């Protein structure tokens, strides 16, 4: 059965822990072209958008859920918002959990809003990321 409004509220199990490394922070900042010194050194802080790396790992559970019948090649990422409780730092071990907040079905497509809650291994909240995706159903011929 394809994704419907009834799937709102579905919460997936926690993703495998992700250890934020200084090397990944430096690599990410370089990809952004951001030479902020806070993103380098022995104990760098991650750029705020680094949280998208963790969000994408969590979205995999949503996109690969066979019950939802989502085709990744038919998904457009429409919106992204982050709310930080604190910055990400090298050495953080982060657990991410994705929840389907809302599904709107319209004329052969679905708008899906999902939230990824990120916390330290000890349960300290770090960031919440909310994203909206548009998924187009394949038209029967």
Predicted regions and their residues:
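Hot-dog-fold acyl-thioester-processing enzymes
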Residues: 1-79, 140
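HotDog/MaoC-like acyl-thioester-processing domains
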Residues: 1-3, 84-141
